């Protein structure tokens, strides 16, 4: 086998359909658009979601729910993520943001109890779950709600 003997597999190189180039091509005259009608015109066609005048699906379905403007969104950090901090250090929302565990503090930081904590830490957060508090205090750490 040599480089000049390489050949693309059958069907790999498909020829483009050149329309409007004479009747002999089979795609001349109306350029595969048929005769008259909205879809034959330039710029013709219906918008996405248009169902021919029938009530469209997105208007048939009922509206549901609302957005609570008072909802608090907390940045979530699990206990296992806190193992990156050195033993005996203080963990607060600012240090979490500096290390990249939290991108944005939002309405506060909540510590959840997923995983195993191997360090003794002083944790300050806006909310802390019971499991997380138990795991932190079991290692000799302190928990403070801001």
Curated annotation (Swiss-Prot):
Keyword vocabulary terms for this entry: Ribonucleoprotein, Ribosomal protein, RNA-binding, rRNA-binding
Q: Which domain of life is it from?
A: Bacteria
Q: Per the UniProt entry, what species is this protein from, by scientific name?
A: Syntrophomonas wolfei subsp. wolfei (strain DSM 2245B / Goettingen)
GO CC annotation, single: cytosolic large ribosomal subunit
Q: Which Pfam families match?
A: Ribosomal_L27A (PF00828)
Function, as annotated, reads: Binds to the 23S rRNA.
Q: Which PANTHER family match?
A: 50S RIBOSOMAL PROTEIN L15, LARGE RIBOSOMAL SUBUNIT PROTEIN UL15M
The biased composition feature labelled Gly residues covers 42-52
Coiled coil ranges (UniProt) are: none
> Does this entry carry the keyword Ribosomal protein?
yes
What name appears for this protein in its UniProt entry? Large ribosomal subunit protein uL15
Listed GO biological process terms: translation
Any GO molecular function: structural constituent of ribosome
Self-association and partners: Part of the 50S ribosomal subunit.
Residue ranges, annotated region (Disordered): 1-59
Residue spans with biased composition (Basic residues)?
A: 30-39
> Which family is this sequence assigned to?
Belongs to the universal ribosomal protein uL15 family.
